[in-house]
């Protein structure tokens, strides 16, 4: 069943779950550049989510917030499941991870940090999709 998904996609998901967000971005961006249609918008959202987390972890809060909002805009329309992942679960976890930053009104917050226990994971609907 997982043969229907490109190897780059599976590798990108694996890297995301290992919190290798910049590397995830690189792998998925290569696939994104070759993709057409609705899958392209979905991949763009995953790329934005990975870089939002990368920025958050590096305390680039403005970049993190901006890319979080862009990722949500691109991923929200895809429903509960898409391209073999439990998207609604991921988006709930993604929002929970960013909630403190989103609620903060300071330009340069000093009390906000990416909390390891809140970093979202991508869960698959297809066995073996994420290695």
What are the language-model segments listed below?
Residues 47-48, 80-102:
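TPR/TPR-like alpha-solenoid helical repeat scaffolds
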Residues 25, 29-33, 72-80:
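Amphipathic alpha-helical segments of tetratricopeptide repeats
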Residues 7-23:
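Alpha-helical segment of the N-proximal tetratricopeptide repeat
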Residues 21-22, 61-62, 68:
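TPR-repeat structural position
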């Amino acid at each position: 069943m997982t043969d229907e998904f490109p190897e780059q996609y599976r590798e990108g998901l694996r890297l995301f779950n290992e919190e290798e967000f910049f590397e995830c971005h690189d792998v998925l961006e290569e696939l994104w550049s070759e993709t057409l249609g609705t899958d392209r918008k979905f991949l763009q959202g995953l790329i934005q989510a990975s870089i939002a987390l990368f920025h958050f972890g590096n305390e680039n809060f403005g970049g993190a917030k901006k890319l979080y909002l862009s990722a949500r805009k691109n991923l929200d329309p895809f429903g509960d499941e898409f391209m073999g992942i439990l998207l609604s679960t991921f988006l709930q976890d993604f929002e929970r991870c960013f909630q403190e930053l989103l609620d903060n009104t300071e330009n340069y917050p000093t009390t906000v940090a990416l909390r390891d226990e809140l970093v979202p994971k991508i869960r698959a609907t297809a066995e073996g999709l994420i290695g």
